Curated annotation (Swiss-Prot):
The keyword RNA-binding does not apply. InterPro entries: BRCT_dom, BRCT_dom_sf, DisA/LigA_HHH, DNA_ligase, DNA_ligase_AS, DNA_ligase_CS, DNAligase_adenylation, DNAligase_N. It comes from Burkholderia pseudomallei (strain 1106a). Its EC number is 6.5.1.2. This is DNA ligase. The gene is ligA.
Length: 691
């Protein structure tokens, strides 16, 4: 069913109402029949409320098939239709506290509750409060305690027979227990999928190379409406009972809360997040209490439901065409909404990560007005095919950063533009590079880039780097925010008067920091390399670089092939080092540190190259405890024979030498089929007898 291409203006109520009916019906079909919802709940609700308003103002425009007159959806062709003995109606929605107060007032008026002169209800109504699950509504029919049929809500009057699929859900009893077993019981409830089960299902889908589900609701609906019940049986579905259709052969409980208590005695699963309250104040207290805990709940909910608790009062209030007067669904602020994507900029993180950010037309979602949303990385933009000018679905849940979920493709304008990742950092002009096998592109101006400045300074001052005692994060924040320090070289120009002027920085602290800076000028090459904050270069690699090259300039000028000769330096690390020193801004800061900052370290000749022995070009990994050799002695023997001794096992490893208590490295070698030697085998290898 195609989306209506032209949206008539509100000034033409007849055309507007017809368009709204068609659009809502199309959305209902996608939601209920195809299980492919393409309209966020908030947008559907907005269109529905608008249609209600037009029909209220123009009663002659109401049609029998209007979405306002029924629930929506129709039986899928693959399932047998089931006519409900009692309609499965939807609920009226409330979105603001005022809607709840108005609902309570209507109920009190309908029940002739006492009020004071100001119209305030003095005899509060008793309500049962429960959660509004984001799943699929189901009717379960039991005859003499035995489960005989299950059906979906469908259009509220006619649903789909899903009996065989429901039988596979372990939470649903096939036989009721207890003493008060009715001749016939029609249980209403919700099939859903818990968050943890949803995550595990998608893991299985990924492993099998199958399509992942967008959310738990889609997963539950798609699982339940399988023509092959074996597929449903493999899916982790759950169920909660919350209502009743027809009852025969037993007394109806006097209250809704009593009904749910009775269900528990019958062995039906009932959610415990419920309460009985009085008046609008009690309703709102329950709503806000649940809202505070919403993200920590093990399942998705999109609101709470209020029902007049007493059954006789429910009967007095009755129904309107599509919903009971005695109940209200109080929805949380929508977590998804539609808006237009105006532009895509890039943001530079503290570690240089380049993140595409969507600039949006303001939209209220998740309880806040959103104008920006993350697009994560370039690959995600391509995968989702998101373009500038698109109408997009934006999601914001709790404190999670807003994200663009998808583009609405049939609303894409002809002039929509594809995103192009910039080649230069917007903050400092340095090159943007993306290493092989990494999703994140990064600015290469680590020592120079303003966006990375605080992180670079903090790392530079670490104990394992230049060990500048007294230069903590709060001091760095002040120095950067007051533009006193732009690069690590500027640290060595700080004077006493500058430091004592900082907030909460006493004279003694200033003198101590100046002393620490003076001491930091005398360091080692390995510490200095580590202090530069080169991506993938830790302490161990910094030491290996210093030992291999002996001085800084050869490292700065080394081609990738030369870097690959360093112990434990692979292609990714070599590429990262090469890119760092290829960036002119970084080289400038290093020269400032050596000249203006006068940071020095002892330098020496490069390490002697290993002779071209029997193991030239081979990579060996040591693991466990050898009988007669220390790890260091074995390493020296192997390197003397031309081998590269690596710290981890990979497909490029030629041999693993294993001693006692060898652990995961040995297991990895066996998994990859790499030859494993003991100490005697290593000696044989060194003698040139093994190939």
């Amino acid at each position: 069913m195609a989306r209506s291409p032209v949206e008539p203006p509100a000034s033409q109520p007849a055309k507007r109402a017809a368009w709204l009916r068609a659009e809502l019906e199309r959305a209902n079909y996608a939601y209920y029949v195809l299980d492919q919802p393409d309209l966020p709940d908030a947008e559907y609700d907005r269109l529905f409320v608008e249609l209600q308003r037009i029909e209220a103002e123009h009663p002659d425009l109401v049609t029998p098939d209007s979405p306002t007159q029924r629930v929506g959806g129709e039986a899928a062709s693959g399932f047998t239709p089931v006519v409900h003995d009692k309609p499965m109606l939807s609920l009226n929605n409330g979105f603001a506290d005022e809607d709840v107060i108005a609902f309570d007032k209507r109920v009190a008026d309908g029940l002739d509750k006492a009020t004071d002169l100001a119209g305030t209800v003095t005899e509060p109504v008793e309500y049962a409060c429960e959660l509004k699950f984001d799943g699929l509504a189901i009717s379960l029919r039991y005859e003499n305690g035995r489960f005989v049929q299950a059906s979906t809500r469908g259009d509220g009057t006619t649903g789909e027979d899903v009996t065989e699929n429901i039988r596979t859900i372990r939470a649903i009893p096939l036989t009721l227990k207890g003493k008060r077993i009715p001749r016939m019981l029609d249980v209403r409830g919700e099939v859903l999928m818990f968050k943890r089960d949803f995550a595990r299902l998608n893991e299985r889908q990924r492993a099998a190379g199958q399509r992942e589900f967008a959310n738990p609701r889609n997963a539950a609906a798609g699982s339940l409406r399988q023509l092959d019940s074996k597929i449903t049986a493999s899916r982790p579905l759950s169920f909660f009972a919350y209502g009743i259709g027809v009852l025969d052969g037993a007394d109806m409980p006097d209250t809704h809360s009593g009904l749910l208590d009775w269900y528990e005695t019958l062995g039906l699963p009932v959610n415990r997040e419920r309460a009985v309250v009085r008046g609008a104040a009690g309703l709102l207290a329950f709503f806000h209490s649940v809202g505070e805990r919403r993200e920590s709940l093990p399942y998705d909910i999109d609101g709470v439901v209020y029902k007049v608790n007493r059954r006789d009062e429910q009967d007095r209030l009755g129904f309107v065409s599509r919903a009971p007067r005695f109940a209200l669904a109080h929805k949380f602020p929508a977590q998804e909404a539609l808006t237009k994507l105006i532009a895509i900029d890039v943001q530079v993180g503290r570690t240089g990560a380049i993140t595409p950010v969507a600039r949006l037309e303001p939209v209220f979602v998740g309880g806040a007005t959103v104008t920006n949303a993350t697009l994560h990385n370039e690959d995600e933009v391509r995968r989702k095919d998101i373009r500038i000018g698109d109408t997009v679905i934006v999601r914001r849940a709790g404190d999670v950063i807003p994200e663009v979920v998808s583009a609405v493709l049939d609303r894409r304008p002809a002039d929509a533009q594809e995103f192009v990742m910039p080649t230069e950092c917007p903050e400092c002009g340095s090159r943007i590079e993306r290493l092989p096998d990494e999703a994140i592109a990064r600015c290469t101006g680590g020592l120079f880039c303003p966006a990375q400045r605080k992180q670079a300074l903090w790392h530079f001052a670490q104990r394992r780097a230049l060990d500048i005692d007294g230069l903590g994060e709060k001091i760095i924040d002040q120095l950067v925010e007051q533009n006193l320090v732009r690069t690590p070289a500027d640290l060595f120009n700080l004077g006493f008067s500058t430091l004592v002027a900082l907030d909460r920085f006493a004279e003694k602290s200033a003198r101590n920091l100046i002393d620490s800076l003076e001491k930091a000028k005398h360091t080692t090459l390995a510490r200095f390399i580590y202090a530069l904050g080169i991506r993938h270069v830790g302490e161990s690699t910094a030491k290996d670089l210093a030992k291999h090259f002996g001085s800084l300039d050869p490292i700065m000028d080394a081609p990738i092939d030369a870097l690959l000769e360093v112990n434990d330096v692979g292609p990714i690390v070599a590429e990262s080092i090469h890119q760092f020193f290829a960036e002119e801004h970084n080289r400038t800061v290093i020269e400032q540190l050596r000249a203006r900052g006068k940071v020095t370290w002892p330098e020496g000749p490069p390490a002697p190259r290993a002779p071209q022995g029997v193991l030239a070009g081979k990579t060996v990994v040591l693991t466990g405890t050898l009988p007669t050799l220390t790890r260091e002695a074995a390493k020296e023997m192997l390197e003397a024979a031309g081998a590269k001794v690596a710290g981890s096992v990979s497909k490029k490893t030629d041999y693993v030498v294993a001693g006692a208590d060898a652990g995961s490295k040995l297991a990895k070698a066996e998994e990859l089929g790499i030859p494993v030697l003991d100490e005697a085998g290593m000696h044989t290898l060194l003698e040139g007898h093994a190939r």
